[in-house]
């Protein structure tokens, strides 16, 4: 048996193999060590021939659904090796084979999957001019592809969040250099990533002559990535994939660009703080799992075309105006369940009887939804109603054939209703009413023969028999066959008893076989309805998301935004949707107005103290814009949203030590990406840019960036720039579309009160020492900091740092160069020259120490 294990293990050496042995799944050798650590099961040993032993750990086969998810969540690939024949029917070693390879990206196990998230498998192909990427969720059948530059593919990988990514063997450095090392990855041979192999695989699966019908024919690299995914499914024994019915192109031009920094810093999907809340947490009131998954997708793919946005908003508003309609949809949605994943299980042959019944319930619930949508005074709802398919024939067949409360597994019996199959009904009568049937035979034969003491009995030697006492044996019919003679009686068998014996002894086994066949036939019939039911699931998910928007809007007092095809962003009394939900009871969120356009107020420079609310204001502006463009109402009194095509944020950076990047370097990388991709319809948010370096460097960079955005010949991007560099307030004097604002505070008795109101004009104080005091800083440090601050402010006033030089810079912008100070100290110049003249490559450690000592003497000489 161990040789059998080793032979199978050699096919998937990187996977943990669960080896079926009787009623257990066992793991051996290094797999056993890994399994015992992850699963918390006992590690033991078993004999391995010639006095040797091998590590072993196992668990009961019925606990597979408990232990398998733990291995997958730990990032392991799991090969399930089952017995392929009944051990009772063979005297040799039981034949075994790998029936499934479960990986983080390929699973349909409910205990592995998160019902609110897609479980995407991705593949990346590195082409010559661009990069191809594909995404597949085998649990829903969604199959998507795209291609473009590395930054676009990086954005897609972060937005879709695949659980596993495939790429060509030997290209790990290229992959991690462009996309990082946070993903679970698997390398495939180079032949998988060839266009001919990929096209052949795709055309064979979709049974088409080309891929033009999917709109992906021109995406060579995307096609290669898509083909690699299908090849991987074959390798992992996932060949029943009839629910993968199309390959869709991710249309970049339809959606607002959100890079991974923006998604993270705006906390769209998850909070950056433990226990914190995200925008998704606030607006997710979806009822169905499909709706929850779609809403998450909408969050990172806002629309940028006016019509589809207004189509969504129209439905949300209709829910508002028609409470009866809303209540009906809400009630039916609770009955539908995870229609999308159930129909996928039908395709792969893993659907349970209870899930089939749930499918019937869902199709029944869709009927009133369809009717209500068709009757609604709303074009978008009418279109949804038209696309919903009741699948009446299969729905009624399920109702007719499957019990309303069947067991979870088909092998438990009791799945098929009475009256569906005559043979099954007869077998059940025999199995469930055996004694009654025997009594009927006994009574009938007694009456027909006139033998009152006749009885029917059973033994293991010749089965069922009729026993007749000797005094009545002359009354026995000729067709009875004598089987045994006793002292006082004779035992006979009849043809009827032999037939009955065969039936009753094998009835239960036959019932299971027949029920399984009838159930399999029904599931096979269901496969013909996969495309229609997938459309139903998509439309129900869409309806669920829009209903969620309506419920959130009513609960939180949101209003419908006005979507306009211009560059005006005008938000009146806007609120941060997440922060306002986290305030203590009784505390009201301070709302603010923000107006940006390309004509008079393109850039707002926001100053103010720490903790005053500058960052919240920036984020709320972006979140309100994003909510509007996914079709949601927004937290404001009014909002006119001039369509945005890109949202950029540079809000809060951290260092990336793994690739040798400091906080400031990360900040500059993000800023460079923004400036290189900005457009006239972009919304740009900068928060405290330049604080990771010296004051003068920071001011210089911040000034130059603001100036660049203002003076850009084509892209007049709407920009909010929060800063502590009060010197930037000088820019308003020389740049007509830059306006100064501050988040106001009130100072009373040497204490700061945060008013959190955005007001016109710049601020001159940061009140950082006040914040330090509030944080519990020792009093001696606070006192000393105040003393130093006063001295520095006095020195700066004397040297004119905040006066004349900045005014001169704002008036003289030649070459966008800022000169705040000169290196004119002769001692420092001498040190600089000494360092510049060093040949570092040929300097020994001793020479370096001597040179450092020389420089030290120069400084002391000063």
Swiss-Prot record:
It holds the Pfam family MutS_III. One of its GO terms (cellular component) is cytosol. ATP binds at residues 608-615. GO terms for biological process: mismatch repair. InterPro entries: DNA_mismatch_repair_MutS, DNA_mismatch_repair_MutS-lik_N, DNA_mismatch_repair_MutS/MSH, DNA_mismatch_repair_MutS_C, DNA_mismatch_repair_MutS_clamp, DNA_mismatch_repair_MutS_core, DNA_mismatch_repair_MutS_N, DNA_mismatch_repair_MutS_sf. Keywords: ATP-binding, DNA damage, DNA repair, DNA-binding, Nucleotide-binding. SMART domains: MUTSac (SM00534), MUTSd (SM00533). PROSITE patterns: DNA_MISMATCH_REPAIR_2 (PS00486). It comes from the Bacteria. GO terms for molecular function: ATP binding; ATP-dependent DNA damage sensor activity; damaged DNA binding; mismatched DNA binding. NCBIfam families: mutS1, PRK05399.1. This protein is involved in the repair of mismatches in DNA. It is possible that it carries out the mismatch recognition step. This protein has a weak ATPase activity. Belongs to the DNA mismatch repair MutS family. This is DNA mismatch repair protein MutS. It comes from Bacteroides thetaiotaomicron (strain ATCC 29148 / DSM 2079 / JCM 5827 / CCUG 10774 / NCTC 10582 / VPI-5482 / E50). The gene is mutS.
């Amino acid at each position: 048996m161990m040789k059998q294990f080793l032979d199978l293990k050699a096919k998937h050496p990187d996977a943990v193999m669960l080896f079926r042995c009787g009623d257990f799944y066992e793991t051996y050798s290094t797999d056993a060590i890994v399994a015992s650590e992850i699963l918390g099961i006992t590690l033991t040993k078993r004999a391995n021939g010639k006095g040797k032993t091998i590590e072993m750990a196992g668990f009961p086969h019925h606990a597979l659904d408990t232990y398998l998810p733990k291995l997958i969540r730990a990032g392991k690939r799991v090969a399930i090796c089952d017995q392929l024949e009944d051990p009772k029917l063979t005297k040799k070693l039981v034949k075994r084979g790998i029936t499934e390879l479960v990986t983080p990206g390929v699973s349909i196990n409910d205990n592995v999957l998160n019902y609110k998230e897609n479980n995407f498998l991705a593949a990346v192909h590195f082409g010559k001019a661009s990069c191809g990427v594909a995404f597949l969720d085998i649990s829903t059948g969604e199959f998507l592809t795209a291609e473009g530059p590395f930054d676009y593919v990086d954005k897609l990988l972060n937005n879709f969040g695949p659980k596993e990514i495939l790429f060509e063997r030997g290209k790990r450095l290229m992959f991690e250099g462009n996309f990082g090392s946070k993903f679970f990855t698997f390398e495939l041979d180079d032949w998988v990533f060839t266009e001919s192999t990929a096209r052949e695989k795709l055309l064979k699966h979709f049974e088409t002559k080309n891929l033009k019908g999917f709109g992906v024919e021109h995406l060579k690299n995307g096609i290669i990535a898509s083909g690699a995914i299908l090849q991987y499914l074959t390798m992992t024994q996932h060949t029943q994939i009839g629910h993968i019915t199309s390959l869709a192109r991710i249309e970049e031009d339809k959606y607002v660009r959100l890079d991974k920094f923006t998604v993270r810093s705006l906390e769209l999907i998850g909070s950056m703080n433990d226990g914190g809340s995200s925008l998704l947490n606030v607006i997710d009131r979806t009822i169905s799992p499909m709706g929850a998954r779609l809403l998450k997708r909408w969050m990172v793919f806002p629309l940028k075309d006016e019509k589809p946005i207004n189509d969504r908003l129209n439905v949300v508003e209709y829910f508002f105006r028609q409470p009866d309609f809303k209540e009906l949809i809400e009630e039916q949605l609770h009955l539908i369940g995870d229609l999308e994943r159930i129909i996928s299980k039908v395709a792969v042959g893993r659907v349970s009887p209870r899930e089939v019944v749930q499918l019937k319930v869902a199709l029944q619930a869709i009927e009133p939804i369809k009717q209500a949508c068709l009757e609604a005074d709303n074009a978008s709802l009418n279109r949804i109603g038209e696309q919903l398919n009741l699948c009446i024939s299969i729905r009624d067949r399920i109702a007719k054939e499957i019990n309303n409360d069947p067991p979870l597994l088909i092998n438990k019996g009791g799945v098929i209703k009475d009256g569906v199959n005559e043979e099954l009904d007869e077998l059940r009568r025999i199995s469930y009413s055996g004694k009654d049937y025997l009594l009927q035979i006994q009574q009938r034969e007694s009456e027909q023969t006139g033998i009152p003491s006749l009885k029917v009995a059973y033994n293991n030697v010749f089965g069922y028999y009729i026993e007749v006492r000797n005094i009545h044996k002359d009354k026995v019919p000729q067709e009875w066959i004598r089987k045994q003679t006793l002292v006082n009686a004779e035992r006979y068998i009849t043809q009827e008893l032999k037939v009955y014996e065969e039936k009753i002894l094998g009835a239960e086994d036959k019932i299971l076989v027949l029920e399984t066949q009838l159930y399999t036939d029904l599931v096979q019939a269901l496969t013909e309805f996969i495309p229609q039911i997938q459309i139903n699931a998509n439309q129900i998910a869409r309806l669920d998301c829009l209903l969620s928007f309506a419920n959130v809007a009513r609960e939180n007092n949101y209003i419908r935004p006005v979507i306009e095809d211009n560059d005006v962003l005008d938000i009146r009394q806007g609120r941060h949707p997440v922060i306002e939900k986290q305030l203590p009871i009784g505390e009201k969120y301070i709302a603010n107005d923000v107006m940006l356009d390309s004509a008079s107020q393109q850039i707002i420079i926001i100053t103010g103290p720490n903790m005053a609310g500058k960052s919240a204001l920036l984020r709320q502006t972006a979140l309100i814009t994003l909510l509007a463009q996914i079709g949601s109402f927004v937290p404001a009194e009014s909002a006119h949203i001039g369509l945005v095509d890109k949202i950029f944020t540079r809000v809060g950076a951290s260092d990336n030590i793994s690739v040798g990047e400091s906080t400031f370097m990360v900040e500059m990388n993000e800023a460079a990406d923004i400036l290189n991709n900005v457009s006239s319809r972009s919304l740009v948010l900068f928060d405290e840019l330049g604080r990771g370096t010296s004051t003068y460097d920071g001011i210089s960079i911040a000034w130059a960036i603001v100036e660049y955005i203002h003076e850009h010949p084509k892209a007049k991007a709407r920009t909010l720039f929060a800063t502590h560099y009060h010197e930037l307030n000088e820019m308003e004097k020389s740049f007509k579309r830059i306006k100064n604002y501050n988040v106001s505070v009130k100072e009373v008795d040497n204490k700061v009160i945060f008013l959190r109101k955005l007001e016109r004009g710049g601020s001159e104080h940061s009140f950082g020492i006040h914040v330090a005091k509030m944080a519990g800083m020792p009093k001696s440090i606070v006192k000393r900091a105040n003393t130093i601050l006063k001295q520095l402010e006095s020195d700066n006033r004397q040297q004119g740092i905040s006066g004349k030089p900045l005014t001169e810079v704002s008036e003289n912008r030649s070459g966008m160069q800022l000169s705040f100070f000169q290196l004119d100290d002769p001692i420092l110049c001498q040190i600089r020259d000494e360092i510049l003249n060093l040949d570092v490559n040929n300097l020994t450690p001793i020479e370096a120490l001597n040179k450092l000592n020389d420089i030290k003497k120069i400084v002391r000489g000063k």
